[in-house]
């Protein structure tokens, strides 16, 4: 976490610089010197407020997660509470819209996933994000499916989101948001058909 006193204007500037440098040279080569140069600040500012590269990466991921949470929450607030399929689509859309689909954001996500396997604090952030996604999905899915079915489908959708993200990040053309939504909605439609047939 950044220390208190960091000017608010500097935080987004440094977060954007971090993602830009990771996009350009990768996580391991993204040095404090390169990031500070990109942001137009001294290395001392980064070291003072963030304690170095690790702290800056953590703050960058927190910002990406905040943006994701805000996008999904805003979309859900615009929909009726009983519009469950639309709300599921809103949760899916939030993971592939605008900011989240930018190349530099997706590459930072990929670096974060890799880093979090060996870092307790980043792993905790990843777990919080994962649990939030599953929780959002289960609230809606349990209104359509039996609890055990909803649990399986929620994890299926989450796995598709992660897998499409990974493939899109590794693709030079980036993430195809329309195709991502089509794939996941096709899966959801098939689950609806499958479990409806079982009830008949």
UniProtKB/Swiss-Prot annotation:
InterPro entries cross-referenced by the UniProt entry: BetI_C, DNA-bd_HTH_TetR-type_CS, Homeodomain-like_sf, HTH-type_TetR-like_transc_reg, HTH_TetR, Tet_transcr_reg_TetR-rel_C_sf, Tscrpt_rep_BetI
GO molecular function: DNA-binding transcription factor activity; transcription cis-regulatory region binding
SUPFAM superfamilies: Homeodomain-like, Tetracyclin repressor-like, C-terminal domain
HAMAP family: HTH_type_BetI
DNA-binding stretch(es), residue numbering of this chain: 31-50
Protein's pathway: Amine and polyamine biosynthesis; betaine biosynthesis via choline pathway [regulation]
Domain HTH tetR-type: 8-68
Keywords assigned: DNA-binding, Repressor, Transcription, Transcription regulation
Function (record text): Repressor involved in the biosynthesis of the osmoprotectant glycine betaine. It represses transcription of the choline transporter BetT and the genes of BetAB involved in the synthesis of glycine betaine.
Domain of life: Bacteria
Swiss-Prot/TrEMBL GO biological process terms: glycine betaine biosynthetic process from choline; negative regulation of DNA-templated transcription
Name by which UniProt lists this protein: HTH-type transcriptional regulator BetI
Annotated Gene3D superfamilies: Tetracycline Repressor, domain 2
